[in-house]
């Protein structure tokens, strides 16, 4: 299982602690140092069954600085994927990628359901 986070993010810290309390093993990836590729994002979007917009960190400084709330609707999916792949700070975090699921953001009930 892959756990993507930004170490300074308090929500990521809570999610990490939650995983560790349950002895759930994962591979840790700093989303700022090693941002997802277009290929990974494409696969995760398909696996998640959610729209690509759910992968954007809409609360982030980068998202706001780039004016993405206004720009995203006019962008193609390929353009959105390319943009997400340029900067891990644009990606919603934490992101948990399992064999048959992807969860963005830490909502404990969703993670419990996904991890069975």
What are these regions (language model features)?
Residues 33-116:
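Thiol/selenol-based redox catalytic cores and closely related redox-interacting motifs
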Residues 1-22, 26-31:
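Local sequence-structure signature of Cys/Sec-based thiol-disulfide redox active-site neighborhoods
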């Amino acid at each position: 299982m892959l756990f993507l986070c930004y170490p300074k993010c308090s929500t990521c810290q809570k999610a990490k602690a939650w995983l560790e309390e349950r002895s759930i093993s994962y591979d840790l990836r700093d989303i700022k140092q090693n941002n997802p590729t277009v290929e990974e994002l494409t696969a995760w979007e398909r696996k998640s069954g959610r729209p690509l917009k759910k992968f954007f960190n809409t609360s982030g400084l980068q998202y706001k600085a780039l004016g993405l709330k206004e720009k995203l609707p006019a962008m193609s999916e390929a353009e959105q994927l390319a943009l997400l792949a340029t900067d891990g700070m644009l990606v919603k975090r934490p992101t948990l990628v399992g064999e048959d699921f992807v969860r963005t953001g830490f909502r404990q009930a969703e993670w419990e359901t996904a991890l069975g």
